[in-house]
Amino acid sequence: MIKQRTLKQSIKVTGVGLHSGNKVTLKLRPAPINTGIVYCRTDLTPPVYFPADATAVRDTMLCTALVNDQGVRISTVEHLNSALAGLGLDNVIIEVDAPEVPIMDGSASPFVYLLLDAGIEEQDAAKKFIRVKQKIRVEDGDKWAEISPYNGFRLNFTIDFNHPAISKNLSNYTLEFSAQKFVQQISRARTFAFMKDIEYLQSQGLALGGSLDNAIVLDNYRVLNEDGLRFKDELVRHKMLDAIGDLFMAGYNILGDFKAYKSGHGLNNKLLRALLANQEAWEFVTFEDKEKVPQGYAIPSQVLI
């Protein structure tokens, strides 16, 4: 049986909030069977909980933000959510003492190492997957995203930026998902931004924590980071990282074939909502027989590195 997973112990880290520029303490806690992924703001009294849920995503302008019915929000959850998805974790409580998750280095890698440092523990209950049964597609102008039936989790993402530093032959990436491939090929890809956009955002009191330490920054001609890129195609890999985190807002790992062109947080969430709203398009599955598990989900996370 493929079992649910949580953390062996609690662990915490301190970082900077992307939008506030303020210090944020993040604590990750183990959680009982069937708890799911739950975000919590401990700076409020009483603390406010945000279970991972596609319908809780109500703002995708600059990041993925969860907003409850009272308008309370927690922002920038996508990179941590991607790390949780990548390692196949099912039950974790995430506490932050601020309105946003710390940005760290702009990738999912610091969260991966934090989770692995806490340790991953199997629980005595079957892990549930969402298996796609029918193709679902959403569009926004020339942008689109779709997911189709597939015995595993495969992703194909294409970006299209008219910029000298982003060549066309580095604008597409395909991944046959496994925890190991996620860690090695996707988790280190950092978020990116254009200098003109950062200057505008900071003039509006946003992205105050944004810097060359936590993002790839481009001017009109080149990448400004002294150390350059971690991968030649780091930008499209990061968009795939975002998509993995956005799709995991369902709270379950997905079995399906995801394809996207110029998609972002909003369209990814629209696709997930459209899938979940169509009862004929998906089903929950568990795997009692390990031999029948799709290959990408068969490798225990404990042996990743």
Swiss-Prot record:
Cofactor: Zn(2+)
UniProt GO BP: lipid A biosynthetic process
Superkingdom of source: Bacteria
Any one GO molecular-function label of the UniProt entry: metal ion binding
Active site residues of this protein: 265
Any GO CC annotation of this UniProt entry: membrane
Pathway(s) annotated for this protein in UniProt: Glycolipid biosynthesis; lipid IV(A) biosynthesis; lipid IV(A) from (3R)-3-hydroxytetradecanoyl-[acyl-carrier-protein] and UDP-N-acetyl-alpha-D-glucosamine: step 2/6
Pfam families from the UniProt entry: LpxC (PF03331)
Keywords assigned: Hydrolase, Lipid A biosynthesis, Lipid biosynthesis, Lipid metabolism, Metal-binding, Zinc
Residues the record lists as binding Zn(2+): 79, 238, 242
EC number from the UniProt entry: 3.5.1.108
Catalytic activity: a UDP-3-O-[(3R)-3-hydroxyacyl]-N-acetyl-alpha-D-glucosamine + H2O = a UDP-3-O-[(3R)-3-hydroxyacyl]-alpha-D-glucosamine + acetate
Family under the similarity heading: Belongs to the LpxC family.
Function summary: Catalyzes the hydrolysis of UDP-3-O-myristoyl-N-acetylglucosamine to form UDP-3-O-myristoylglucosamine and acetate, the committed step in lipid A biosynthesis.
Annotated protein name in UniProt: UDP-3-O-acyl-N-acetylglucosamine deacetylase
Name of the gene this protein is made from: lpxC
